[in-house]
């Protein structure tokens, strides 16, 4: 979302753009999941195509050590506060009015099973950005760079190689 905003505001300063499962637009019939009201288990099930996969379990396991657990909670609180400042109550801060300014090659990467920001948003970004390419990664949720790293890196490398 922030990258798209910067690209729309400063298109002459940006050579290329990659948006991964990005917020920034709003589709009334396909709302973005309110990430802030989710329990830890709901978050695990919604972030990943398979909430029981090795990466999902690794990323959602809470450490036994109280100091480590406290540090994770502090980091999560800071992260959610920062995200909340930019993304809510509605993750549409007017980008749709500026998106026509994004004129650089743009890669849009989405998981086909993104339950946080559905792939409908990838299609909308693709429709609104002139020089964009949408890649939807199969059997993948909201975090393709972690859930499908090979496919993610292949898409990024192909994109960079083509510009």
What are these regions (language model features)?
Residues 87, 114, 141-144:
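Glycosyltransferase donor-binding loop in the core domain
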Residues 4-9, 15-45:
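Flexible "cap/lid" loop of the alpha/beta hydrolase fold
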Residues 102, 108-110, 114:
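Short beta-strand/loop motif that positions the catalytic acidic residue
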Residues 131-163:
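Catalytic active-site module of serine/aspartate enzymes centered on a nucleophile-bearing elbow/loop
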Residues 95, 104, 118-126:
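Short alpha-helix in the alpha/beta-hydrolase fold that links the catalytic acid
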Residues 4-8, 123, 153:
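Short, hydrophobic alpha-helix immediately C-terminal to the catalytic nucleophile
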Residues 19, 28-30, 45-104:
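Conserved alpha/beta-hydrolase catalytic His-Asp/Glu region
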Residues 1-2, 143:
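Short alpha-helical segment within the catalytic ATP-binding CA
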């Amino acid at each position: 979302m922030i990258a798209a905003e910067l690209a729309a505001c400063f298109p002459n300063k940006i050579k290329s753009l990659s948006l991964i499962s990005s917020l920034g637009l709003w589709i009334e019939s396909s709302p973005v999941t309110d990430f802030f009201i989710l329990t830890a288990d709901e978050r695990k099930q919604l972030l990943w195509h398979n909430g029981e996969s090795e990466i999902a379990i690794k990323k959602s396991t809470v450490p036994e050590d109280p100091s480590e657990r406290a540090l994770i909670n502090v980091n999560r609180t800071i992260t959610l506060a920062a995200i909340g400042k930019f993304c809510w109550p509605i993750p549409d801060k007017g980008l749709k009015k500026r998106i026509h300014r994004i004129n650089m090659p743009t890669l849009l990467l989405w998981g086909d099973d993104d339950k946080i920001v559905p792939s409908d948003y990838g299609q909308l970004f693709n429709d609104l950005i002139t020089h964009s390419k949408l890649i939807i990664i199969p059997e993948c949720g909201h975090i393709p760079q972690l859930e499908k790293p090979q496919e993610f890196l292949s898409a990024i490398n192909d994109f960079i190689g083509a510009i």
